[in-house]
Amino acid sequence: MRRAVLEILEERIIHNVKEIHRFSGKRIIAVVKANAYGIGVREVSRILEGLEEVDAFAVACTQEGVELRECGIKKKILILGGILEEDVKLLEEYDLTPVISDPEHLKVLKDRNIKFHVKYDTGMGRLGFTNEIIKDPRVEGVMSHFSSPADRNFSKLQIKRFEEILKNYEKVKYIHLESSAGLIYRVPFTTHVRVGLAIYGEKPLKDYPLEVKPALRLRARLISVKELPENYPVSYGRTYITKRKTKLGVVAFGYADGLMKTLSNRSFLIFEGRKVPIIGNITMDMTMVDLSGTEARTGDWVYIVNEERSFTPLARDAGTIPYEIMCNLSRRVERLVIKKR
């Protein structure tokens, strides 16, 4: 039985990539780390590989880069999350491009003929050099990262700092700063944009100017539908007591599949376009919903995410960010690419 399916809408992925390219005027470094934000790196990267707007991919570690190569990706692959001595052999064998953000990373490369990008910390307080200029013919690109793109004043300060640093680098092929949210700044001196979330149609900011479309549908099966009497408890801890006779649906999707427990008693799923409230505590493998007034039957599909409600508002209900919910989608969820017609 298919318990849960994440549908990846190829046509919308392609639309979103073209919209990002149209808006920015730049080619894209597609961020597909963490299994493409939980969506499915093999499925997503194979769509993106064939798009001329996508110039390169970015992942967190060498192991993720190796996985991309093994599923047939030929384009450039950046390793964003640092390297150690043990990574060098894989960098060479799989033609991976490291991002250098610490003096020790440079020592690891020694005299190896491996091109790399240099990362600068312009206000993120995480990875990156601050003022050090790397004079090395192997430098192929320079990058930085916004810490809070919604804060326009601080983001403009980061842009200014990055521009000053770039005065020390001439003729580098790749200069990248803008993320999905950072696209709004249209930084004039970058060559590429480094984007993940917007590819899937999630809007990282209110009043987002790009016309991206939700490209994901997450659905799960009803494995039981039954009537409960008034004043009857639902799920662990009896945090919900029925207020009337209730048609209870048990959905084969729980926190082990990626639905955060914080959504218990405070959000909804979608059945045939109708919002059905989550009632009681979400459990490891199941979620209970109130199906009263519907014709739902065991075996029907209920949507967690679709064109009506993307991961972003779902995350808002959970008190988190869409990245966290997406990255928590487990391997029990089947990934299915819906091909462009």
From Swiss-Prot:
Chemical reaction(s) catalysed: L-alanine = D-alanine
Entry annotated with the keyword Cell membrane: no
Cofactor: pyridoxal 5'-phosphate
SMART domains recorded: Ala_racemase_C
UniProt-annotated binding residues for substrate: 126, 284
GO molecular function: alanine racemase activity; pyridoxal phosphate binding
Protein's pathway: Amino-acid biosynthesis; D-alanine biosynthesis; D-alanine from L-alanine: step 1/1
Active-site residues, as the UniProt record annotates them: 33 (proton acceptor), 236 (proton acceptor)
Keywords for the protein's UniProt record, in alphabetical order: Isomerase, Pyridoxal phosphate
One annotated Gene Ontology cellular component of this protein: cytosol
Entry's EC annotation: 5.1.1.1
Keyword check for Ribosomal protein: no
PANTHER family listed in its UniProt record: ALANINE RACEMASE, ALANINE RACEMASE, CATABOLIC-RELATED
Other facts: Strong thermostability.
Entry function: Catalyzes the interconversion of L-alanine and D-alanine.
NCBIfam families in the record: alr
Family per record: Belongs to the alanine racemase family.
Protein name: Alanine racemase
Gene: alr
